[in-house]
């Protein structure tokens, strides 16, 4: 991206490009949260959206240090490449990392393990960590184009004392005026990337030369098909007897638990190739590759009502 792509002069006015306008909006939201709340935290999964969000947060306060920690809710069923990228990024940026482990809640008897996916258990661990650390705001990397429940959620999304979201009782948001009012025990989820699309995310990754986990690009992997989705063979996820293992060139469009994240056949090995592929896609990444969203027609909304990301 060149300077002329970012800033144009039109009839005596300087105008930001679409991508730089999204960046400015996200940075404004991040700074607004930092100014308005006492103990914010940035939720970080190691996926492309949370990496872009962290990049924006660091940029928002440069040359100073990030004034809030980063938190990863660790199910224990992560892709190795994602954990490696997380640790490298934390070391490079110098941010403070808080890791909330689902395994700790299993060991303490606070939750009962669900087989094979621990995805539903993340909500309890997330809310426990927010409560124990007394966080009053949590940044999330959700985008409105991903899924219909996320499409109707506000940028500042209120959570009650139980961490629950009520989609029928959302606060009005006029222009860039955000209402963060809450009482003790309640908190706000803030979504700086609400108005971004998957195409915008990848365009920004290319423009800013942001490093991602290698699984976002084409690679050879042993997979099997289940319910029309390609799933990776892993120690936490094995095929059934009627599901043959095949080796394909694939990449991941979104990153979650090994047990519920599918991949797509692809030869896109560079950012520009992924951008070209994304431009012609007619399915969102969650719709195409997330088994956890297929639990029911309202699977995401039901989980968000309980306190999910």
Curated annotation (Swiss-Prot):
EC number in record: 2.7.7.4
GO biological-process terms attached to the record: hydrogen sulfide biosynthetic process; sulfate assimilation
Pathway of action: Sulfur metabolism; hydrogen sulfide biosynthesis; sulfite from sulfate: step 1/3
Keyword check for Nucleotide-binding: yes
Keywords: ATP-binding, Nucleotide-binding, Nucleotidyltransferase, Transferase
A Pfam family assignment: PAPS_reduct
Keyword Glycosyltransferase among UniProt keywords: no
Gene Ontology MF terms in the entry: ATP binding; sulfate adenylyltransferase (ATP) activity
Enzyme class: transferase
The reaction(s) this protein catalyses: sulfate + ATP + H(+) = adenosine 5'-phosphosulfate + diphosphate
InterPro entries named in the record: PAPS_reduct_dom, Rossmann-like_a/b/a_fold, SO4_adenylTrfase_ssu, Sulfate_adenylyltrnsfr_sub2
Superkingdom of the source species: Bacteria
Residue stretches in coiled coil: none
Family statement drawn from the similarity comment of this UniProt entry: Belongs to the PAPS reductase family. CysD subfamily.
Assembly and interaction partners: Heterodimer composed of CysD, the smaller subunit, and CysN.
Protein name: Sulfate adenylyltransferase subunit 2
Species whose genome carries this gene: Mycolicibacterium gilvum (strain PYR-GCK) (Mycobacterium gilvum (strain PYR-GCK))
């Amino acid at each position: 991206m060149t300077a002329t792509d970012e800033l144009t002069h039109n009839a005596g006015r300087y105008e930001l490009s679409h991508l730089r306008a999204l960046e400015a909006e996200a940075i404004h939201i991040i700074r607004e949260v930092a100014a308005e709340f006492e103990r914010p935290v940035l939720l970080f999964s190691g996926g492309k959206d949370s990496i872009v969000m962290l990049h924006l947060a660091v940029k928002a306060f440069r040359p100073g240090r990030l004034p809030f920690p980063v938190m990863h809710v660790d199910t224990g069923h992560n892709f190795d490449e994602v954990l490696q990228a997380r640790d490298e990024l934390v070391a490079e940026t110098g941010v403070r990392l808080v890791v909330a482990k689902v395994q700790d809640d299993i060991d303490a008897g606070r939750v009962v393990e669900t087989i094979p996916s621990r995805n539903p258990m993340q909500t309890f661990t997330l809310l426990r960590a927010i409560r124990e650390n007394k966080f009053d705001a949590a940044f999330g990397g959700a985008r409105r184009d991903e899924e219909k429940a996320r499409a109707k959620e506000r940028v500042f999304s209120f959570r009650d004392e139980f961490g629950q979201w009520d989609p029928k009782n959302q606060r009005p948001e006029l222009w860039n005026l955000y209402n963060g009012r809450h009482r003790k025990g309640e908190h706000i989820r803030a979504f700086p990337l609400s108005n971004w699309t998957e195409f915008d995310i990848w365009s920004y990754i290319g423009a800013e030369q942001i490093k991602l986990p290698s699984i976002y690009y084409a690679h050879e992997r042993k997979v099997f098909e289940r319910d029309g989705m390609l799933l990776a063979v892993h120690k936490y996820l094995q095929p059934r007897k009627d599901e043959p293992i095949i080796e394909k060139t694939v990449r991941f469009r979104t990153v979650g638990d090994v047990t519920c994240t599918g991949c797509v056949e692809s030869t896109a090995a560079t950012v520009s190739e992924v951008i070209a592929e994304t431009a012609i896609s007619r399915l969102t990444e969650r719709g195409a590759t997330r088994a956890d969203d297929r639990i029911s027609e309202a699977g995401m909304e039901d989980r968000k009502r309980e306190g999910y990301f």
